[in-house]
């Protein structure tokens, strides 16, 4: 499978499925100091709200990085994932001790879960892929439906605006030949879907989500990966303190490859 073949797949679910024949989600969040910034940040915000005995649903669970982390802290996890490659990687790591109920399915249809059955819901993968606004809203509404009243939903987006600088770091000609609208600076939504901070915020407001935090979840960590990965443990710890110092500043939120929104179901 390559990008040209992927682009020819018309069915969105199948296209998303095959995307992970190309991209290795299993190692994305853990292969280096720079890569772990997003994971560390996301866990930090989840743990602000997680209580003993909470039930967690991980929608678009990938290869299970978050599911395993919280299952091994004693939480009961339900995980739903679409892509065959991710399901296979997830299953290889499952042990009898892991309290994880893994289901292969689509984030647009959570009918296997009852209304108001989870205290915490993760929506970290689906909004990287859904292009149609109606599908985005349906996905969010399904996450809301299965979340208890007052429960917390964690949303991840890929930031449209900062990706330019990250790609420029790989390709000095990106601004002349990159795959984006040269007038509006909107990236082409392939193979992933990109949102500005404002677009992500409006999407959640439209679903009546009470936004508690807007976070630059990895900041410039990919752009600065070489330097970050060279850091001593002491320097890395201080870098993370700096990252947490700036990651919710309004002027810095969009300066990140990934965005984390923490919402409360009203």
Predicted regions and their residues:
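Conserved class I S-adenosyl-L-methionine
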Residues: 1-52, 65, 69, 154-179
């Amino acid at each position: 499978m390559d990008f040209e073949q992927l682009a020819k797949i018309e069915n969105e679910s199948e296209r998303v499925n095959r995307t992970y024949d190309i991209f290795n989600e299993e190692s994305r969040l853990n292969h280096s100091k720079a890569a772990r910034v997003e994971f560390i940040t996301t866990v930090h915000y989840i743990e602000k709200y997680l209580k003993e005995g909470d039930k967690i649903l991980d929608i678009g669970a990938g290869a299970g990085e978050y599911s395993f982390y919280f299952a091994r802290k004693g939480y009961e996890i339900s995980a739903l994932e679409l892509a065959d490659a991710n399901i296979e990687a997830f299953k290889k790591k499952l042990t009898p001790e892991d309290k994880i109920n893994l289901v292969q399915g689509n984030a647009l249809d959570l009918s296997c879960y009852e209304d108001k059955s989870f205290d915490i819901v993760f929506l970290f993968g689906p909004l990287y892929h859904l292009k149609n606004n109606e599908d985005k809203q349906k996905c969010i509404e399904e996450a809301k439906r299965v979340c208890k009243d007052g429960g917390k939903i964690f949303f991840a987006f890929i930031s449209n605006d900062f990706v330019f600088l990250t790609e420029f770091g790989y390709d000095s000609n990106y601004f002349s030949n990159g795959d984006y609208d040269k007038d509006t600076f909107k990236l082409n939504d392939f193979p992933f879907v990109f949102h500005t901070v404002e677009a992500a915020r409006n999407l959640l407001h439209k679903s009546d989500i009470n936004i508690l935090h807007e976070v630059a979840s990895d900041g410039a960590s990919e752009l600065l990966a070489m330097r970050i990965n060279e850091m001593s443990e002491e320097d890395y710890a201080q870098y993370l303190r700096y990252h947490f110092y700036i990651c919710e500043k309004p002027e810095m939120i969009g300066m990140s490859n990934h965005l984390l929104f923490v919402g409360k179901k009203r």
